[in-house]
Amino acid sequence: MTAADSFVQAVQVLPLRLRGEALSLLEGDRARTEELRLRAGWPMTALIAGAERPLGGPPVEGEELDQLVEIASRASRHAVLDQIRRGYLTIEGGHRIGLCGTAVMREGEIHALRALSSADLRIARQVEGACAPVLDGLCPGGRLADTLILAPPGLGKTTLLRDLIRAVSEGEGCLPLRVALADERGEVAAMYGGRPQLAVGRRTDVVEGCPKAQGLMLLLRGMGPQVLAVDEITAPEDVRALTAAAGCGVTLLATAHGNGREDLLRRPLYRPLLEEGVFRRLVRIERPGGKRVYTVEELS
């Protein structure tokens, strides 16, 4: 599927008027569109090559935001209530709709969203081959080393993680291994109807929708993985789960926000992972001059 085709697939979830606005974009712009933003009271905008621009139509109505959710849920909000509580919906093709509105709270937790005020349709695109520049450096002797992918937000950590999972699972440039993925927010595999919407390989098992630490332990106990993967280490329990898994002989593959090894050592959350030698390789992603650059470093 081409980038423009992915755009056309994604916008089918929009109400009719907004869908027509989106499809008025030229094919070249469709291929470069990353997101469509719908804000009540303002015209819909498109994020194209990093720049947000209005599409020129009338302001988005609150009813259109409700229609968006009705279409995305196939007229069954109850079936997707757990996703809505987390602020997003995953639709066929791996595309994602982020939602904002008034939170309905119960016992200190978000139970639902009402009076929707904005939505963000993020267009999913598979980037097969993204891991090619780093694969040799991460697979000494043909087998994946414990690897941490590190970069500031928005530089492609998840894209690189997904393609590494796919390559390892398929035995592309390395030994084929069983991979288990804890995909808390569904951003890596984008499961829909029990199937990954984005390619993560034939030997990959996925659990999504639960906290990362719990997902890691579930996979470790139940699926016998050779590689355990997770996107975005963000909490102490994630660190504890990865440290425990490292002691079980499974290879680890993870991402984190940061700028380099010294940055991680200064932060209490990540310091134990480096001091205890949980990871053997570090991949840094930078974008000087607008082009991504990957650097592989040995950590031990």
Segments the model singles out, each with a brief description of its role:
Residues M223-L282, R287:
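Conserved P-loop NTPase nucleotide-binding/switch module
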Residues L160, L164:
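Hydrophobic positions on the alpha1 helix immediately C-terminal to the Walker A/P-loop
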Residues K157:
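Conserved lysine of the Walker
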Residues R77-A145:
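P-loop NTP-binding catalytic core
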Residues M1-G93:
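N-terminal accessory targeting/assembly segments
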Residues I149:
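Hydrophobic anchor at the beta1->P-loop junction of P-loop NTPases
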